[in-house]
């Protein structure tokens, strides 16, 4: 495989091409991209954890340093002003010398407010991309050039197509996340609490809890029925029944997002249901190919859920087609089949049909689906079906004409296990699908 530096060099060529195109389209001279600033907690002198502007880390793998600036015009070498204060109160990141610094002019910026003296004097035709509009106004950027929608739509649309450098980074993020999942499973088997399982995960991935790309979901037993459960109980339950782990990792600013579900005992109905969800997830991935609308795979999985509900006698005396048509599968899988993945976990432009930002909403029947694009080579997506036992969603079905088809006794017996989700991260290629997660032998 090519070195990361060689891949990065080509990555910058691609970003420069996109920049030239978008600047020509909107008749602008350059883009000034801001890493962001620290924001203090209200009435306190303590800042929230810093999260970098994703459009900034698309160019450089600098994810922990506020007050940095990039100036790009698609022609000249990108300029990075790297915040390098004299400060004995806080750690200061050294001026970077890494695989990527040959492709960027790196300039020390000793004072956060010193950027104004470094920029070109004529700024009326420079666009600002960043989280602090007032800072841009103070630099003389025109109000209509601050986060201009057309520019951002264009940049977001093409972020769906990963460069080889980006794919290499995402494969590295997978490795960390897989290590974390294995450590967390061992912690679960040894009877640890959610809090301690999470600590084992972070240790194995080398992340702090502020470094992971999203808050880890570490859910034992019925907690797995809360889709984004992040509480982390300090005490292990008296009886271990199930464990759902939805946790990722980051490498050079690129995310992994994996989910696995395990049963404490391998011979009960819930364990058999996990195996079947896993098998259907893999079967769905085997049908994927470039040129198909992502929505089709979501709809297809509802048909697969109907098959499982029937096989496990959770819904009875109804055809699989009728289950889907009448949305009896809906309360069991209330979220989408997945989403784009990249610099952000729920990566941008999932609904964008072209580089002008044309929006195609999710079907009204499945409003929580996060992607309606036709999948194409170089896209990275999650495939994360699930079956859950969520009382607030099941309750309306306990009354009415369809209630008789639900095997309430069996459903209620499943509720203490919470639910199941299996999530892999896949890359679309011209004639194949690469499953980055399974390639690392995460069962």
UniProtKB/Swiss-Prot annotation:
PROSITE patterns: PROLINE_PEPTIDASE. Mn(2+) 2 binds at residues 246, 257, 423. CDD domains: Prolidase. One of its GO terms (cellular component) is cytosol. SUPFAM superfamilies: Creatinase/aminopeptidase. One of its GO terms (molecular function) is phosphoric triester hydrolase activity. Its EC number is 3.4.13.9. Mn(2+) 1 binds at residues 257, 339, 384, 423. This is Xaa-Pro dipeptidase.
């Amino acid at each position: 495989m090519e070195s990361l530096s060689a891949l990065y060099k080509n990555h910058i060529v691609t970003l420069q091409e996109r920049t030239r195109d978008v600047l020509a389209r909107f008749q602008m001279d350059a883009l000034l991209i801001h890493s962001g600033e620290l924001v203090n907690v209200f009435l306190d002198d303590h800042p929230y954890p810093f999260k970098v502007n994703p459009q900034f880390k698309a160019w450089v793998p600098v994810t922990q340093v506020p007050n940095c600036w990039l100036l790009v015009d698609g022609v000249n070498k990108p300029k990075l002003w790297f915040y390098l204060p004299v400060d004995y109160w806080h750690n200061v990141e050294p001026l970077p010398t890494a695989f990527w610094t040959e492709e960027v002019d790196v300039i020390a910026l000793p004072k956060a407010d010193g950027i104004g003296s470094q920029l070109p004097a004529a700024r009326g035709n420079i666009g600002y991309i960043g989280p602090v509009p007032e800072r841009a106004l103070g630099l003389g950027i025109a109000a209509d050039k601050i986060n201009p929608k057309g520019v951002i739509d264009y940049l977001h649309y093409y972020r769906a197509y990963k460069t080889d450098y980006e794919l290499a980074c995402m494969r590295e993020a997978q490795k960390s996340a897989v290590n974390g999942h294995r450590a967390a499973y061992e912690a679960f088997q040894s009877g640890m609490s959610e809090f301690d399982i999470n600590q084992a995960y972070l240790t194995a991935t080398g992340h702090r809890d502020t470094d992971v790309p999203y808050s880890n979901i570490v859910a034992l037993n019925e907690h797995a029925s809360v889709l984004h459960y992040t509480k982390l109980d300090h005490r292990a339950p008296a009886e271990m029944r199930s464990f759902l782990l939805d946790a990722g990792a980051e490498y050079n600013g690129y995310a992994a997002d994996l989910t696995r579900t395990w049963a404490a005992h391998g011979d009960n109905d819930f364990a058999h249901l996990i195996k079947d969800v896993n098998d259907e997830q893999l079967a769905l991935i085997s049908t994927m190919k470039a040129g198909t609308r992502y929505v089709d795979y979501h709809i297809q999985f509802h048909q697969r859920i109907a098959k499982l509900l029937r096989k496990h006698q959770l819904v009875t005396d109804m055809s699989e087609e009728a289950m889907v048509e009448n949305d009896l599968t809906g309360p069991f899988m209330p979220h989408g089949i997945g989403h784009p993945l990249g610099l952000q976990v729920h990566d941008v432009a999932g609904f964008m049909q072209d580089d002008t930002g044309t929006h195609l909403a999710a079907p009204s029947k499945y409003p929580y689906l996060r992607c309606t694009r036709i999948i194409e080579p170089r896209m990275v997506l999650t495939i994360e079906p699930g079956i859950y036992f969520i009382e607030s969603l099941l309750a309306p079905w306990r009354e009415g004409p369809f209630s008789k088809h639900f095997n309430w006794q069996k459903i209620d017996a499943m509720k203490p296990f919470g639910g199941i989700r299996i999530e892999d991260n896949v890359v679309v290629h011209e004639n194949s699908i690469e499953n980055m997660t399974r390639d690392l032998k995460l069962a």
